[in-house]
Amino acid sequence: MKSLKKKRRIQILVAAAVALVLAVGLIGYGFRDGINLYRSPSQMAENPPEAGEVFRLGGLVEDGSLVRGASETVTFRVTDGGATVPVRFTGVLPDLFSEGQGMIGTGRMEGETFVASEILAKHDENYMPREVMDSLKEQGVYQEPNS
């Protein structure tokens, strides 16, 4: 009788372990394309992304760098005070997107240019994404709003 209980207990533990491994595997598989790492221009200069890697780039849109093409293609440069990355985006920019303001773009590198598939801009004149604020503070160029 004890042997049967022990055998049943082991079967339950093995089944639970297999279910746990399957669940973790399915979660990892589901997130494989949904996790985009954030990088500042300085981080990209120090550790370039792998070819084809999708990631988020954030910083300030450099003054005087915004060029609107004849179509919906826009080019500009993003900086964090330490490094600058050229960006190309085809699509409609958010209404609050402008030079000297914070932005985060999702995309990948093509040569030396970051090709964005999505651009996010600040919410109001005082908002800045936390990642951008942290990287600007790290570079020593962050200024408090209204200062």
From Swiss-Prot:
It holds the Pfam family CcmE. InterPro entries: CcmE (IPR004329), CcmE-like_sf (IPR036127), NA-bd_OB-fold (IPR012340). It is a single-pass type II membrane protein. Residues 1-9 are cytoplasmic. It comes from the Bacteria. Keywords: Cell inner membrane, Cell membrane, Cytochrome c-type biogenesis, Heme, Iron, Membrane, Metal-binding, Signal-anchor, Transmembrane, Transmembrane helix. Residues 31-147 are periplasmic. It is found in: Cell inner membrane. Heme binds at residues 123, 127. The chain crosses the membrane at residues 10-30. One of its GO terms (molecular function) is metal ion binding. One of its GO terms (cellular component) is plasma membrane. GO terms for biological process: cytochrome complex assembly. Belongs to the CcmE/CycJ family. Heme chaperone required for the biogenesis of c-type cytochromes. Transiently binds heme delivered by CcmC and transfers the heme to apo-cytochromes in a process facilitated by CcmF and CcmH. PANTHER family: CYTOCHROME C-TYPE BIOGENESIS PROTEIN CCME HOMOLOG, MITOCHONDRIAL (PTHR34128:SF2). This is Cytochrome c-type biogenesis protein CcmE.
